[in-house]
């Protein structure tokens, strides 16, 4: 019944990466000119720019902004929310740090920032990779269908600029942002028609999202 978003204002054009040094997975510096790398990247992805959050913001901040937007759009009292579900992957990471902060969970931080006092408004996180928000929607729908909830707030948020390896050319893919949706019980027909979920962990699939070392072996790998 309502949706909201937070799109950062700090725009990074592809040209931002012209002076960056890129390395491969073996730590060898790429010999291609950066303009060639950028042009090929653009031809494959179509990406010309990405948005990064400002230094004074964090993932829970942009999640809250998106949530406020969705609440206003739905015109509901936030105290009537039964669940707040936040899908993310890396929690809060202050600018200049690589330390992941997930305790208290981001959903609790969002609830606090929204000044919701109702203890029956249950707030929890899910770490589910890229489709985390979709899985959050599936869970919210299940709560409503089971009669366990009437109103749910589902948020997807990440500040990937805080965790990317700037020496990896794939870092140009990632950006920051948050989106939020209000789901409400209704007597009318409609809603999510069908869905399915899956988790693949065979061979090395469990490590597809792995916070590893920098491609540049000359930098301090102890700092995350």
Question: Where do the PLM segments sit?
Answer:
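Condensing-enzyme catalytic core mediating Claisen C-C bond formation in acyl metabolism
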Residues: 1-56, 168-224
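Conserved catalytic cysteine-centered active-site region
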Residues: 34-60, 93-151
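Flexible, glycine-rich active-site loops centered on histidine and acidic residues
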Residues: 145-178
């Amino acid at each position: 019944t309502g949706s909201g978003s937070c799109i950062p204002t700090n725009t990074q054009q592809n040209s931002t990466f012209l002076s960056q040094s890129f390395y491969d997975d073996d730590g060898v510096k790429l010999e291609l000119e950066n303009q060639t790398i950028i042009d090929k990247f653009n031809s494959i992805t179509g990406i010309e720019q990405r948005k990064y959050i400002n230094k004074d913001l964090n993932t829970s901040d942009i999640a809250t902004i998106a949530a406020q937007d969705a609440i206003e759009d739905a015109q509901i009292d936030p105290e009537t929310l039964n669940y707040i579900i936040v899908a993310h992957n890396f929690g809060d990471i202050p600018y200049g740090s690589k330390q992941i902060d997930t305790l208290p969970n981001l959903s609790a931080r969002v609830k606090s920032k929204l000044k919701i006092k109702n203890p029956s408004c249950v707030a929890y996180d899910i770490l589910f990779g890229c489709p985390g928000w979709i899985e959050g929607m599936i869970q919210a729908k299940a709560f409503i269908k089971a009669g366990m909830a009437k109103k749910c707030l589902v948020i997807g948020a990440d500040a990937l600029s805080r965790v990317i390896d700037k020496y990896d050319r794939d870092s140009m893919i990632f950006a920051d942002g948050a989106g939020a949706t209000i789901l409400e019980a209704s007597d009318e027909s409609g809603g999510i028609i069908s869905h399915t979920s899956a988790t693949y962990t065979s061979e090395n699939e469990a490590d597809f999202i792995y916070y590893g070392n920098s491609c540049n072996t000359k930098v301090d790998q102890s700092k995350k």
